Regions:
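Sequence context of c-type cytochrome heme-c attachment sites
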Residues: 22-110, 114, 120-149, 169-192
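A contiguous, mid-protein "functional segment" used to position or interact
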Residues: 148-166
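Generic low-complexity segments that are intrinsically disordered, proline-rich and/or Lys/Arg-biased
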Residues: 8-9, 188
């Protein structure tokens, strides 16, 4: 039991630390990726077909049974309420305004835009990043929670050896993942 608890505790503490750094102590609400879709439709469509967008589904009983068995997990168990899984399979779990459960916060199921780009409750509102304000300044939205530069530390909160699906010699290849991308990237229409 000790072996399982300590790594999971490190994951939770690490996530809280990085999220705390990205918001500089401010609390911003999570709004869900559907809000990002309004302005970033092509990116949203690209992301919605990724493993990250649909990663919550693997927590359901019977999903990826072979991989779960190989990892020492019970393939028949429902992991959709397991706190040690929700940290990396939902958006904002354990954070103020983050994922609570499927019924309460269905818009935060899966790894959404805000897991990488920060909780959007402030930066998608007036006077910041809105359809009415197409000339917002990037520095202004970064100051209110947008994470503009994705770092290896942010990714490694979940992509690490604490995952039951990788071995102890697993190394997350940030360069390859960044090159591959989580969603297609399209040029912005307006200068920021």
């Amino acid at each position: 039991m000790k072996r399982v608890f300590v790594p999971q505790l490190r994951i939770v503490v690490g996530i809280l630390f990085v999220v705390g750094l990205s918001t500089a102590g401010d609390e911003h609400a999570f709004v869900g990726s559907h809000k990002c879709r309004v302005c970033h439709l092509k990116e949203y469509k690209s992301w919605s077909e990724t493993k990250m967008a649909n990663v919550f589904d693997v927590l359901k009983p019977g999903e990826r049974a072979e991989e779960k068995t190989a990892a020492g997990l019970d393939p028949g168990k429902d992991y959709t309420t397991d706190p040690t899984c929700l940290t990396c399979h939902t958006t904002g779990y354990g954070e103020n305004g983050g994922f609570v459960d499927v019924e309460t916060t269905p818009k935060l199921v899966g790894v959404g835009c805000e897991m990488c780009h920060g909780a959007g409750g402030t930066y998608i509102e007036e006077p910041y990043m809105t359809l009415k304000n197409k000339s917002y300044k990037k520095d202004a939205v970064v100051a209110v929670g947008l994470v503009d530069t994705i770092t290896v530390a942010r990714c490694e909160l979940c992509h690490n050896t604490e995952s039951p699906f990788v071995g102890p010699d697993y190394v997350f290849d940030f360069g390859a993942r960044k090159e591959e991308g989580t969603h297609a990237k399209f040029p912005l229409k307006y200068e920021h």
